[in-house]
């Protein structure tokens, strides 16, 4: 039973979440439940997230209906919720406070010192790593993440310490509502232009994100990324801690080695004033150059927050990873199956580079493009980001509610891959055809990585059993 304490100084009815099963919404709902709010919410269908929240005491409605908000004190919604949603309409009619997801997260952050992790890619993993190092340092943070942290079995945790660590989502600009003590910027790419309009606007958004921190805070920024390095030149009134592999970085990672068990590396801290600090032979059970950079960001922050070297070393060595981030779902007939959320060309290239580093055989990529607009805007990049895969299997586009766009589909991506020189790019006729296709392509020692933000994750968990059945 959750021990409730009074979160506000007066009686408050249930807080209603529209789309409570979403990964971002469910984390905030869980934190609010655990600190004493009465929480309810609706979603289109039941899920592991709604079931978990129901067990914690939330009232869950399946489907959307105006009657669900009867008696609610406020409504929390995300940009995915349409204005004509019946619960939104009812909330407006009742003049209830309509609170955006990021605004509610900002309310939770206001009560503690906070670390907000931003960047086009790597936010979820970096958030999890910061949490792991603060846990190892006995700081016991509260955490709200955009993915399931394997060590917690959930994407949120209420800690007893002074710090809260959150993932800051830039996709709709709402991360600018998060006034954090510490900010992290992992990288900046031209993504979510449907909201921002131009890449210049994206870059200005990240500048504002950093400038939202107080004078006593700091931002950890990856100057290996050219746009982040350019951003540092525009920040004049906030303290920056730079990190990366480049010699100019204040927190520099080097001697990176990859293997089947993960990564090993050194980190040298060269503060502008003070002594050099060397963390030698750090080990992490997660592969990929991009994940080493994410770990370097976490070390930079943990060190500033007072976590000692032994705790940093132990926290990295024991890092349990994040669901859907290079997650092994099984091994069938010697073929390793990996599930990954990567759905942007930069992410896909990084994941495949990691796969190449740990695989003793071929790397076979199965990709489900996510959104027609993303594929249209980045068709050239998608056509050239699979070089580390021996075979690329392309599924139909996961629409995410978008209408089809002429000339933007599975077959055009396969054609683009071939034009850019890929030697083996195949179209997947249907999900049902995947097991037989993988059985024909893969042999013992190969690694199959399924990539995408849609329902391809379900295929990755079914595939090991399907391959074993075919082998009988």
UniProtKB/Swiss-Prot annotation:
What biological processes does GO assign it? cell division; cell wall organization; peptidoglycan biosynthetic process; regulation of cell shape
Give me the residues that bind ATP, please.
Answer: 119-125
Which of the seven top EC classes does this enzyme belong to? ligase
Q: Which NCBIfam families does the annotation name?
A: murC
Keyword Zinc found? no
Pathway given in the UniProt record: Cell wall biogenesis; peptidoglycan biosynthesis
Among Pfam families, the record links this protein to: Mur_ligase, Mur_ligase_C, Mur_ligase_M
Q: Which family does it belong to?
A: Belongs to the MurCDEF family.
Please tell me whether the keyword Cell cycle is annotated for this protein: yes
Lineage start:
Bacteria, Pseudomonadati, Pseudomonadota, Alphaproteobacteria, Caulobacterales
GO terms (molecular function) for this protein are:
ATP binding; UDP-N-acetylmuramate-L-alanine ligase activity
EC number(s): the record gives 6.3.2.8
Places the protein is found: Cytoplasm
Identification of the protein by name:
UDP-N-acetylmuramate--L-alanine ligase
Reactions this protein catalyses: UDP-N-acetyl-alpha-D-muramate + L-alanine + ATP = UDP-N-acetyl-alpha-D-muramoyl-L-alanine + ADP + phosphate + H(+)
From what organism does this protein derive?
A: Caulobacter sp. (strain K31)
Task: Alphabetically list the UniProt keywords.
Answer: ATP-binding, Cell cycle, Cell division, Cell shape, Cell wall biogenesis/degradation, Cytoplasm, Ligase, Nucleotide-binding, Peptidoglycan synthesis
Name a GO CC annotation attached to this entry: cytoplasm
Functional description taken from the UniProt entry:
Cell wall formation.
The protein's predominant localisation is cytoplasm
What InterPro entries does its record include?
A: Mur-like_cat_sf, Mur_ligase_C, Mur_ligase_C_dom_sf, Mur_ligase_cen, Mur_ligase_N, MurCDEF_pg_biosynth, UDP-N-AcMur_Ala_ligase_MurC
């Amino acid at each position: 039973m959750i021990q409730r304490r009074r979160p506000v100084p007066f009686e408050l009815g249930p807080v209603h979440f529209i789309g409570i099963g979403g990964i971002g919404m469910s984390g905030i709902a869980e934190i609010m439940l655990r600190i004493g709010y009465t929480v309810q919410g609706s979603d289109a269908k039941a899920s592991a997230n709604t079931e978990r929240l129901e067990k914690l005491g939330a009232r869950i409605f399946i489907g959307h209906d105006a009657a669900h908000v009867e008696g609610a004190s406020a409504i929390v919604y995300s940009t995915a919720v349409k204005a004509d949603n019946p619960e939104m309409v009812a909330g407006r009619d009742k003049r209830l406070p309509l609170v955006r997801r990021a605004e509610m997260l900002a309310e939770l952050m206001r009560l503690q010192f906070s670390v907000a992790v931003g960047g086009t890619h790597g936010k979820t993993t970096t958030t999890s790593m910061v949490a792991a190092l603060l846990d190892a340092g006995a700081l016991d943070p509260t955490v709200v993440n955009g993915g399931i942290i394997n060590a917690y079995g959930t994407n949120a945790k209420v800690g007893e310490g002074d710090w809260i660590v959150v993932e800051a989502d830039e996709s709709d600009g709402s991360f600018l509502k998060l006034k954090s003590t510490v900010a992290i910027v992992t990288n900046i790419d031209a993504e979510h232009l449907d909201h921002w309009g131009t890449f210049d606007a994206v870059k200005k958004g990240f500048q504002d994100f950093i400038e939202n921190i107080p004078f006593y805070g700091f931002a950890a920024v990856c100057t290996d990324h050219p746009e982040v390095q350019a951003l540092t030149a525009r920040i004049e009134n906030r303290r920056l801690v730079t990190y990366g592999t480049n010699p100019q970085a204040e927190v520099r990672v080097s001697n990176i080695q990859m293997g089947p068990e993960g990564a090993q590396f050194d980190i040298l801290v060269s503060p502008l004033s003070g002594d050099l600090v060397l963390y030698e032979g750090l080990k992490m059970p997660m592969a990929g150059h991009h994940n080493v950079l994410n770990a370097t960001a976490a070390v930079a922050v943990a060190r500033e927050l007072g976590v000692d070297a032994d705790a940093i070393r132990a926290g990295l060595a024991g890092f349990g990873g994040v669901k859907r981030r290079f997650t092994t779902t099984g091994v069938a007939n010697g073929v390793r199956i990996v599930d990954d959320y990567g759905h942007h060309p930069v992410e896909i290239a990084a994941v495949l580079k990691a796969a190449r580093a740990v695989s003793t055989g071929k790397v076979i990529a199965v990709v489900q493009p996510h959104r027609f607009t993303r594929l249209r805007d980045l068709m050239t990049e998608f056509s050239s980001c699979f070089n580390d895969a021996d075979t690329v299997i392309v599924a139909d586009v996961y629409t995410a509610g978008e209408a089809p766009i002429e000339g933007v589909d599975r077959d055009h991506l396969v054609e683009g891959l071939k034009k850019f020189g890929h030697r083996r790019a195949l179209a997947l006729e249907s999900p049902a055809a995947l097991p037989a296709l993988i059985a024909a392509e893969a042999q013992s020692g190969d690694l199959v990585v399924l990539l995408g933000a849609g329902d391809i994750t379900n295929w990755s968990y079914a595939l090991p059993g399907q391959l074993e059945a075919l082998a009988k």
